[in-house]
Amino acid sequence: MSGLIGRKIGMTSIFDENGKNIPCTVIEAGPCVVTQVRTIGVDGYEALQLGFDDKNEKHSTKADLGHFKKAGTVAKKKVVEFQDFVSEHKLGDVISVDLFSEGEFVDIQGVSKGKGFQGVVKRHGFGGVGQATHGQHNRLRAPGSVGASSYPSRVFKGMRMAGRMGGDNVKVQNLRVLKVVAEKNLLVIKGCIPGCNNSYVIIQK
């Protein structure tokens, strides 16, 4: 498995050779620095730790500064491990968007937009209770019954109710890479990806 850390720029659309309008997402992918190399002998597994997006030194702890100094780079805001990286890299190597090529498929992981406290109609797609007429006046978006009566005298775990929506780790799989703009470290991905603009995403292939 290989991958990069990126930042979601936003959505746009492009036209293909047949004149079809395709919605797509632009991602600033890398460059990422190898900040640590995990080995089986020391750590029990193989992985590369990549860092992305420079961090102000005054906002970093001494432990962070020492960790990134070993890799010969400044402190990074986002650090992610990629296990079983396909190609060999050493500490301090820079991995760029050239890792990807046009036409291949990638998986993208991010944190979905937070929606706050929402009801069951928006959060779970409930249809509401009853109809809008014939005396009904306050149950249009109600959840309805949440359990039985005296037996089992409780609400089962996992019952879908109102609550906080969004802000979850979401992975979208098999998204096609439409364009790779190497000189600007940009990836153009077909379709939408989780997260708001300027949020961090993990791109895997």
UniProtKB/Swiss-Prot annotation:
NCBIfam families: L3_bact. This is Large ribosomal subunit protein uL3. GO terms for cellular component: ribonucleoprotein complex; ribosome. GO terms for molecular function: rRNA binding; structural constituent of ribosome. The gene is rplC. Keywords: Ribonucleoprotein, Ribosomal protein, RNA-binding, rRNA-binding. InterPro entries: Ribosomal_uL3, Ribosomal_uL3_bac/org-type, Ribosomal_uL3_CS, Transl_B-barrel_sf. GO terms for biological process: translation. Pfam families: Ribosomal_L3. It comes from the Bacteria. The lineage of its organism: Bacteria, Pseudomonadati, Bacteroidota, Flavobacteriia, Flavobacteriales. PROSITE patterns: RIBOSOMAL_L3.
